[in-house]
Amino acid sequence: MAVGSFVALGDSFTEGLDDPRADQAGYLGWADRFAEMLAARQPGLRYANLAVRGKVLRQVTEEQVPRAIAMAPDLVSLAAGGNDLLRPRGDPDALAEHFDEAVRTLLMAGCQVLIFTGFDTRFPVLRLIRGKVAAYNMHLRAIADRHQCRLVDLWSMGVLYDPCAWSADRLHLTPDGHRRVALRACEVMDVPSAADWREPWPAAAGIASSPARAWLAARRTDLRWARVHAAPWVARRVRGVSSGDGIGPKRPELLPL
């Protein structure tokens, strides 16, 4: 199927955090990068990105899905549910039912749907929700199979297990992490690309340290992460505030690149 228009839906992952633009404010991210790769093969491609950081699945389906349908795009990407699973009451089974309904709604509107699973992040704190993410991913794979949708399985992308793929907050990808996801999306969508997302990361330079020193350095990094990133996130949850409050989509109209 030729793709002449593409709308990206979701949260901070699809908005593009932490992949800052070099030429202007805001973020690039995998979706922008994928759209550029797609446009190189499909001149005149129109693209919109309705994703906003902090959004939970219900907000994505209620606020973004109807707007996407109104644009009548050929392709819609849907990556959502991660913010729900970070919450203690996040239920992967209930989320999957909601996700399936959104996919069916998009398909009935004539859109092709590109689904993303959740990541297998291996940092100590996020490991606490690993089981919930795994269960949710099983549902997402079943949804993709049931509706014959293309699926980008982020969990199986071993190259993203490397800390180099993740920014300091351990929740968002680095620019090269986003680039690799865009390349994987191209592969799933049969879009030729010159690079390979499996390419090994550059070898880390530095002086080798003893296991004890390495352990201490890792714990210092964990403490700094808790102070700089985890504590503010918890404080926002207590106040009922989202990082996306007051922020609109970065590319709300379906326009040529």
Residue locations for each model-derived region?
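Serine-esterase "nucleophile elbow" of acetyl-processing enzymes
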Residues: 1-53, 65-72
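Structural beta-sheet core signal
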Residues: 8, 78, 114-115
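Oxyanion-hole/transition-state-stabilizing segment in secreted/luminal serine hydrolases
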Residues: 15-19, 43, 57-94, 121
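Conserved catalytic region of serine esterases and O-acyltransferases that act on ester linkages
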Residues: 146, 176, 180-257
